[in-house]
Amino acid sequence: MATPTLDAFQVIADPSRRQILQLLTKDSYNINSLAENFEMSRPAVSKHISILHTAGFITINEIGRERYCTLNKNGFIELRNWINHFDEFWTSKLKKLEITLNKKTKNNKRI
C-alpha cells in the first residue's frame, strides 16, 4: 500500500503549524519547549510536529533523550515553486501592460 503524501498547502493551513514554523526560524527547539508556546497538550503539539516532519518542513534530531526540531528547506520547495509560477505570471502581465501604455503614450504625443 502506498504511503499518502501530504500537500504542503494543507500542512501550512493550520495556524498552529505555521506558528511552529515561525518559532523554528529563531532556533532549534525540543518538543517540550515548543509545547510551552501553545495552549494545547503536548501530544497535540507532537501530532503537529509529526505532520510537519512527514511533509518535510522540519527535521528531528535526537540528542540524548531529547528530540530537537529544526527547519528543513526542502519542505518549502513546493510552496516556493507555486508562488514563483504566479510571480512570473504577474511579472509578464505587468510588463505587457507597461509596453501597451508606453505605446499609447507615444501615440498621444504624436497627435
Where are these regions (language model features)?
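Short, hydrophobic-biased segments on the C-terminal half of alpha helices
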Residues: I49-S50
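Short basic coil micro-motifs at the edges of alpha-helical modules that engage polyanionic partners
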Residues: F9-Q10, Y68
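Helix N-cap at the start of a conserved alpha-helix in ABC-type nucleotide-binding domains
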Residues: D14-P15
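Pre-recognition alpha-helix immediately N-terminal to the DNA-recognition helix
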Residues: R18-I20
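Short, Lys/Arg-rich nucleic-acid/phosphate-binding segment
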Residues: E62-Y68
